[in-house]
Amino acid sequence: MALPNQQNVDLPTFKLLIVGDGGTGKTTFLKRHLTGEFEHNTEPTLGVDIYPLDFFTNRGKIRFECWDTAGQEKYSGLKDAYYIHGQCAIIMFDVTARHTYMNIDRWYRDLRRVCKNIPIVLCGNKVDVPSRQIKPKHVSYHRKKCLQYYEMSAKNNCNFEKPFLYLARRIAGDAKLSFVESPEAQIDNLDVESLQLLTVEAGTQPLLMTRISFEFNTLSIE
């Protein structure tokens, strides 16, 4: 479950680069995670926008610092500076626009030139649109480069969190890592009577401080 940015000095944070041609839905995808709303019309990204997205996992809370880069060619000279110290990436194309798929090799080569061996996910967005031009049988680039591939839709939540989960597992080196509900969401699901009983009981108990350790294997960036 993704949550908006919350201040936490000790929170494990990983720089995620999201790249692809303009209009593929990168910003809409991130804002969908951030706000829960689907924005039909978003302004083109100018340079880069950064969105901190928090997820609760079975090993603790983590944050992806998502660098949403501009897809327009006029900003191409700035890409290398944005990519420095990237730890994982998503390459997005639009299944309704053939040229965005044809350009993914350029985005891949740019990432590899700066970030070397970081885990990368390829995402085909807008699968909810009936008039798609790139069918599943046409998508083969990920097999050539040994990338994980997901067909997704920011509009109807198809494979909504899978790119983040895959990248979290790769960075953690833990194939069993899973996303869980936030503690806040679990409390909201309690009925009123149970919540009142817990509140009364808590008032009679001494305060205990606990600490959850969380260790991730970070990738070395050459």
From Swiss-Prot:
Span list, region Switch-I: 40-48
Positions of the Small GTPase Ran-type domain: 10-174
Region (Switch-II): 71-87
GO cellular component term, pick one: nucleus
GO BP field: nucleocytoplasmic transport; protein transport
GO molecular function: GTP binding; GTPase activity
Keywords from the named record: GTP-binding, Nucleotide-binding, Nucleus, Protein transport, Transport
Domain of life the protein comes from: Eukaryota
Subunit structure: Found in a nuclear export complex with RanGTP, exportin and pre-miRNA.
Similarity comment: family membership: Belongs to the small GTPase superfamily. Ran family.
Name recorded for this polypeptide: GTP-binding nuclear protein Ran-4
Record organism: Arabidopsis thaliana (Mouse-ear cress)
Gene name of the encoded protein: RAN4
